[in-house]
Amino acid sequence: MQESSKNSWCLYVLRCADGTLYTGITNNLERRLKTHNSGKGAKYTRSRVPCEIVATCFMPNKSAGLKSEHRFKKLSRQQKLDAIQEGIEKLFPEYLNTDQNDGNSD
């Protein structure tokens, strides 16, 4: 997973308690995860807590985040799992901010 940068937007993928995946964007990942796990997040995750972050990809702006979210949600479950395994940032090279991604995947 990439490191967060102040004021950046993040595409995130959660694995819910029932094993399903949920994808969203946020500009505050920690707060958004707490909201999901408190049962006050998206309607989809409310009955599927707890959720854990399985992938993130930081974007340069909200527009890039929304476009990436839309593209990721169109993938099949298997394609999503493969992308998570390989690193979802590889799906969106046009949006990667080189200041945030130095090529290391620590």
What is each model feature region?
Residues 1-40, 46-49, 55-56, 64-73, ...:
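GIY-YIG nuclease catalytic motif and its immediate N-terminal context
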Residues 78-82:
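Coupling/hinge elements of helicase-like and P-loop NTPase modules
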